[in-house]
């Protein structure tokens, strides 16, 4: 067998199947586009669902890809096994109703055994098949010539995820020899068993049945092929190394970890776990961020945060106690650059994100340890066992490996309730598995739409009306020849001016009519074969297939949509100009009455930045720039500087919307002919939608004017109420009112202090001596939570060597504050005092050794909490 680099294996695979008439499908971003069922692209076939379910027809029925993927259902196994990964590449060849078992098996055998390709020794290959799949058996045995002893029948060789396509599969195994798997059970020592000797290198799925709702199976009219070969595993076989982590995909990362940690890989099993965790997770994190994901507290962002924190925790076992993961990004970029240049192109941005996350986690790590210490105290006082749910929360929220929790617990003479912990883990796995199965289920779209292939030409770029013919009617999921008034129907036209929802732009609305009927069009979408599919309600008459009709778009809405779409392009360019090139579109909505634009950026925009962006857009509007739209090949478009939206896929011919020099962008939407038609642009809000993603909402034209007019009316009302005549006087008057308010509040605060002081009497007389300390513990009557802190400041100035603890009832809520002279904080800590008191009033709190505060919801227990804290100090 040839010894090949991973990049060479990838290229050979693609080249082989191109020779066999396959179309290369580029690797899609890890963040799914137009697929809300997936958290991540998790397999090679995930990006091809649109072809398998009929939403789109591929240029060729034969497809090959090398798809990057993320799976996080087994995170806890990564690092402890030879081949578990969260990020991996899946090589795959696919047939959409073209070739089937014969060719799929022959292709696989040729690629693996031919000296031109992988050059594997045929006598080291074994296969598994489903017991009832005699067709696959005969191909392997009679056509390929594989001995019967190397064809293993396994009941589990059937790909089935519930309703939808399913079928038997055949897996190909490579025998690595007797040196491998010596510690594995003898009963598992066969291809398909749990062992290290026989490695599965390729899985061929023969999708030939439909799994029906009643659990029966019927043959599919079009049979498909779906195969998968893990690049990392094939590299380990080709390079003859024990695990995936010793291939050229990982070893440069391992070498860098060795330099930083001063530890060696493959010397100590416990240390090796940390090496593998770090190397795996940095690949996942770097690629996910390069594809638009960012750390967050939910969704895919939470997965990234959890992976990064897990890697940081394991790095500490190697003695690395400072941010360093970000330094590995350049190495990942260098390894993967030949096929994935995106990581290198965005390396600076990726490193900034990772470094920021690392710094934050090192800060919060102390909090996690503090929580664990509290759990230990709680366990010592009760069962001598840390609650499993608490341990799981520590693991899941703070990224603490359970091994670390157990280790610290053992040092404290405790156990961890692993039964409950494992139960929580299993529930999480079950949720992940269910989500994965749901996401993989391919819903076959209506065969009616899939079988309609007649052309429907969009003419709406040039006109909002058209004389055309109604060619197809779909009612209640069936194609019909006529529909009566009052019904909702889907239909197609030979030519249509109606834009179908796409690229963030909403669909046109309007009417389709003739003398006999009228349809009010409410939605337009793309059918599986690319036609515009209209939805509408029949207003009157009887609609018939073949009717000649007039199609008219609502032109007022169309004009407003055009303005908003062109303004969105200007906004995108302005954001890049003001904030930086890291800004990428993360979503958009272009409607008639407004526009919404989501983009990647670290934090909230300042008012000055918003003003700059708004002015830039308006300046381009007022320049009256002609909007030139051309169709050209993708290479020419990029050469002229056209901006392609991140994550979008484009065909060979693209449409360029040119507002040069400010904005040149690839876009299929409808636009104004000159920027002056937009009239006016006004940002009405800027907000966050998630970690690292901001959202701008804006108005144009008449809507922007009406918005400003409304603001002016409110401003005039305010002037009237303030009794000022000119606009300039408003700010002066407002400042005057604010100053007066501050003065009154200060007077009120002073009066509150005086009242409290009168009620308290001589506080020196209330100081007690407890356990050798001067202590003032009392309830105070104050009007608000701020006043208790002010009262504390007064008491501290008078009692500088005294421990002071105050509590108050403000609006049926407890406020507490404690101070300890700094000379005493080695023995008594204010934070501890509040933490002891707070639970008694059903609250919580904490703070520094010299000052702490807290609150609670049971003011009836204030006296009890004050008595308790006196006893607590007495027993220190």
UniProtKB/Swiss-Prot annotation:
The record describes how the cofactor is bound as: Binds 1 zinc ion per subunit.
Q: Which SMART domains match?
A: tRNA_SAD
Subcellular localization, per the record? Cytoplasm
Instruction: Give an example GO biological process.
Output: alanyl-tRNA aminoacylation
Which GO cellular component does the record give, naming just one? cytosol
Report the cofactors: Zn(2+)
Q: According to the UniProt entry, what is the EC number of this protein? A: 6.1.1.7
Q: Which reaction does it catalyse?
A: tRNA(Ala) + L-alanine + ATP = L-alanyl-tRNA(Ala) + AMP + diphosphate
Q: Which residues are involved in binding Zn(2+)?
A: 565, 569, 667, 671
Any one GO molecular-function label of the UniProt entry: tRNA binding
Q: Which keywords label this protein?
A: Aminoacyl-tRNA synthetase, ATP-binding, Cytoplasm, Ligase, Metal-binding, Nucleotide-binding, Protein biosynthesis, RNA-binding, tRNA-binding, Zinc
Query: Regarding domains, what does the record say?
Result: Consists of three domains; the N-terminal catalytic domain, the editing domain and the C-terminal C-Ala domain. The editing domain removes incorrectly charged amino acids, while the C-Ala domain, along with tRNA(Ala), serves as a bridge to cooperatively bring together the editing and aminoacylation centers thus stimulating deacylation of misacylated tRNAs.
State what this protein does: Catalyzes the attachment of alanine to tRNA(Ala) in a two-step reaction: alanine is first activated by ATP to form Ala-AMP and then transferred to the acceptor end of tRNA(Ala). Also edits incorrectly charged Ser-tRNA(Ala) and Gly-tRNA(Ala) via its editing domain.
Membership in a protein family: Belongs to the class-II aminoacyl-tRNA synthetase family.
- Name-wise, this protein is Alanine--tRNA ligase
